From Swiss-Prot:
One of its GO terms (biological process) is DNA recombination. This is DNA repair protein RecO. The lineage of its organism: Bacteria, Pseudomonadati, Bacteroidota, Bacteroidia, Bacteroidales. The gene is recO. Involved in DNA repair and RecF pathway recombination. Keywords: DNA damage, DNA recombination, DNA repair.
Length: 245
């Protein structure tokens, strides 16, 4: 079956001497894996295709999908838009690598989700186009991503004015520390309501130290880890921590 779709590059790994495997998030088919020629000798389009397979590149692809196969072939591909600033700016590029790694871990199903796809594509365009401080971009992305994923926590205190523990497993405030030992303590959980309002447009108003930003990121990732297992350790947060004061 021939499909035509927009698709976002998540990850590319070596497969054998002839091919690598590119993992793409397709608007029409969800996550799909493709064999990418490692040498232009395997076809006149192999070399150009290989150059397009870069994290968070959005492509328009024509691909051949065969039933009962996990690996497919891309017949034609072109960039939907040029993200020159993401490629050339170290800060944007580091954020892009984090987003790509994160999405690679959580987007696993070969099922179309157009709302989710459109949000991710919109976010990539924002990363390319925005000016000014970018230190909170990844936090705004993770908070806003909860909506299309259907993982929005209940951030109401339930009538209580006393700060309470937040249980990431249940996604709600609780009176006591959760038994699993990974709850967010009261003196920090109150910030969740504040940060739940963060967007790409207002993120510059959220002033955080490097340590505070990393703490918020760790709490967010842990929330995802509870709700989308299995969730291995991320490699890119340490890179982000070195960039922003």
């Amino acid at each position: 079956m021939i499909i035509v779709s927009r698709a976002i590059v998540l990850h590319n790994t070596a497969y054998n001497d002839s091919y690598s495997i590119a993992h793409l998030f397709s608007r029409e088919s969800g996550r799909v894996s493709y064999l990418i020629p490692r040498s232009s000798k395997r076809g006149k389009s192999g070399g150009s295709l290989r150059l397009l397979i870069s994290p968070l590149n959005e492509l328009e692809i024509t691909a051949e999908h065969k039933q009962h196969r996990d690996l497919h072939f891309i017949k034609e591909a072109k960039l939907c838009s040029l993200h020159g600033r993401i490629q050339s700016d170290p800060v944007r590029n580091s954020i892009a690598l984090f987003l790509a790694e994160f999405l690679y871990l959580i987007l696993r199903l070969p099922e179309a989700d157009t709302n989710l796809y459109d949000f991710v594509a919109f976010s990539i365009d924002k990363l390319e186009e925005m000016d000014g401080p970018m230190a909170n971009f990844h936090l705004a992305f993770l908070f806003r991503l909860l909506v299309p994923l259907g993982l929005i926590p209940d951030l109401q205190f339930g009538g209580s004015v006393i700060p309470r523990w937040f249980d990431p497993a249940d996604g709600r405030f609780v009176p006591n520390a959760p038994a699993h030992g990974r709850g967010i303590p009261p003196h920090q959980s109150t910030y969740l309501q504040l940060f739940s309002r963060i967007t790409f447009d207002n993120m510059k108003a959220f002033r955080l130290s490097r340590a505070e930003r990393r703490q918020v990121l760790d709490y967010l990732v842990d929330y995802y880890r509870f709700h989308l297992p299995p969730f291995p350790l991320l490699k890119t947060p340490d890179i982000l921590s070195t960039l922003f004061d």
